[in-house]
Amino acid sequence: GSTRIVGTLIESALKQDHEVTSCSVFDVDPTRFNDFDFIVLGSNSWFENKEEGQMNSGFHALKEKLKLDSFKGKKFAIYALGDSNLYHNTFCKAADHLEKLVREFGGDAVVPPLKVDRFYFDEEGNETKIIEWAQGLNQFLKQQQSR
């Protein structure tokens, strides 16, 4: 759905200057995180475990497979989708949960998260926002490589 569309837009922007591999959280092999220099995680904000604003259930399953240092030394960017009209108190809280997950397992979210509001209500405006964020991320990564 919309999370995949956003991921594809980010992937397209990053592919301009970087080798990119993408997969669903349901298909990820936790041992492969060491194969990558930088990782982007994304999720809609869901009603999970009787609470609004949670990350996708696939991340809860992934968390069970991770070791305490699974993300040690890894850098991350995070994006989340939500609806500020219907869920203003929990808008894009999935981003907060993903940042906590990254920190809990030794990683570092190095750029502010992208928060996409009501994706399908303004696809064109949101696509512009997503592409701009991804281009900024691309520039950040290029600067990191040149150091």
Question: How would you describe each model-predicted region?
Answer:
Residues 24-34:
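Short acidic low-complexity segments
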Residues 2-5, 13-17, 21-22, 35-147:
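FMN-binding flavodoxin-like domain, especially the glycine-rich phosphate-binding loop
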